[in-house]
Amino acid sequence: MAVTSAKKNPGSPGIEELISRLEEITRNIENPETGIENSIALYEEGLAIAEQCKKRLQEARKKIEIINPELAKNWPDTARNRDLFDSEI
């Protein structure tokens, strides 16, 4: 069975693409040949992408809570999970 992706905005990148870009940004920042100004610009881009990812994960969690409240009740409510879904980046 083929897996399809439902996006609100077909022109926006999916979470997988966003995470891939974050990984690329990390590699570029870690590269000693990347200058400080470029590293700062990459860092700012990474923060913006991380915020997009966080919002999408929050939306996904809310949908799952509506679709399957029993599943949501069994999620571990650790400090890490609360930080991920409820805090500001």
UniProtKB/Swiss-Prot annotation:
Keyword Signal: no
Record localization: Cytoplasm
Reactions accelerated catalytically: Exonucleolytic cleavage in either 5'- to 3'- or 3'- to 5'-direction to yield nucleoside 5'-phosphates
Top-level taxon of origin: Bacteria
Single GO BP term: DNA catabolic process
Gene Ontology terms, MF aspect: exodeoxyribonuclease VII activity
GO-annotated cellular components: cytosol; exodeoxyribonuclease VII complex
Alphabetically ordered keywords of this record: Cytoplasm, Exonuclease, Hydrolase, Nuclease
Enzyme class, broadest EC rank: hydrolase
Enzyme nomenclature, EC number: 3.1.11.6
Function description: Bidirectionally degrades single-stranded DNA into large acid-insoluble oligonucleotides, which are then degraded further into small acid-soluble oligonucleotides.
PANTHER family, A to Z: EXODEOXYRIBONUCLEASE 7 SMALL SUBUNIT
Known partners and oligomeric status: Heterooligomer composed of large and small subunits.
Family membership noted in the UniProt record: Belongs to the XseB family.
HAMAP family per record: Exonuc_7_S
Annotated protein name in UniProt: Exodeoxyribonuclease 7 small subunit
Source taxonomy: Bacteria, Pseudomonadati, Chlorobiota, Chlorobiia, Chlorobiales
